[in-house]
Amino acid sequence: MRPVFPLLALVAALALTPPVLAQSAPVDIGVGASATRENETTLVATAAWLPEWRRTENGVLRWELGAVYVRGRDNTRFDLSEDAGVFHGGARYERDNGFVAGFGVGVQAGRTSALSGNPQFVSTVGWRWDHVSLLARHISNASIKQPNDGETMLVAVWRFR
């Protein structure tokens, strides 16, 4: 099933390109590693469109429309071999000093022991230096459906704008 996800990612990117260019809002692209039960790790890739919602005295609150791709894992005793994707929407707060925090709700494509049902909740905390960010993210369905191991990831991000 792996060949399906690059095609879905391309379709999503092409569909989002006109609104992204029209709004000239920042776009974050990231890559990193995710871990789940017993530290089974894998590659992750992320993309997010972040139009400004409102400015505060010490930062900016942004809408976040994004996608996370989690590569399937081989040679594990858990059901983690299928690639999974989560498409999410939410909000992200970016302080002027670099602190970043966000939360969103999404839907998934693909099913594993770690990501096993909708909705999926995406929480983010990290730090941003101009165009570079280091973000810790957790994706989980909050035990609405079992199994629910979730994915916890560390992602290095580059901001385009």
Predicted regions and their residues:
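Short glycine/proline- and aromatic-enriched beta-strand/turn motifs that initiate or cap beta-hairpins
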Residues: 20-75, 87, 151-161
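Short glycine-rich loop/turn motifs that provide flexible caps or phosphate-binding loops at active sites
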Residues: 29, 101, 105, 125
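Outer-membrane beta-barrel strand-turn architecture
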Residues: 51-59, 93-99, 126-131, 160
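Mid-chain, structured segments of secreted extracytoplasmic proteins
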Residues: 63-105
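Cleavable N-terminal export/targeting peptides
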Residues: 1-24
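A membrane-pore/channel beta-structure motif
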Residues: 95-99, 105-112, 134-137
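Solvent-exposed loop/turn segments connecting transmembrane beta-strands
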Residues: 34-44, 57, 73-83, 97, ...
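Predominantly the C-terminal beta-signal and adjacent terminal strand-loop region
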Residues: 24-25, 117-161
